[in-house]
Amino acid sequence: MSILVNSETKILVQGITGQTGRLFAERMVAGGTPVVGGVTPGKGGALVAGLPVFDTMREAVAATGADAVLSCIAPAYVVDGLYEVVDAGIDLAVLYIENIPVHDAIKMCAYAKARGTRILGPNSAGAVSPGRANMADLNDANLRPGRIGIVSKSGTLTYEV
């Protein structure tokens, strides 16, 4: 059973041209996760891991029908980046970003909640439906489909399970 992501989820990687975003995109594509593109301002038209890169989230959603985002952008840009994600109509945002001030996290969560976007993070390990979609920092080789799911507040502790 999948709750947050599955084989029908259309995922964008925000910050796809950065080192972390590129590594996630390559791993997700190789694992069969339904990634449809990425967003990095000023890099529209490029390809990363065979995926199209767009300049804005609205442009990416219009072109791909994406409904989920894995955000791998620098902490200094995360508030504006999340607002762009929410305003583009994304249903789920996974914020794989550390060192976000508490007040920024509170603002982002309130903004997203008021507009119907679910957030995992900041500092989230992500979301996985084994064998269907993996938008997390968890290795597919260690995951199996089944009846049991795990939710963790701590990405680091999730690795121990």
Model-derived segments and spans:
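Catalytic-core regions of core metabolic enzymes
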Residues: 1-161
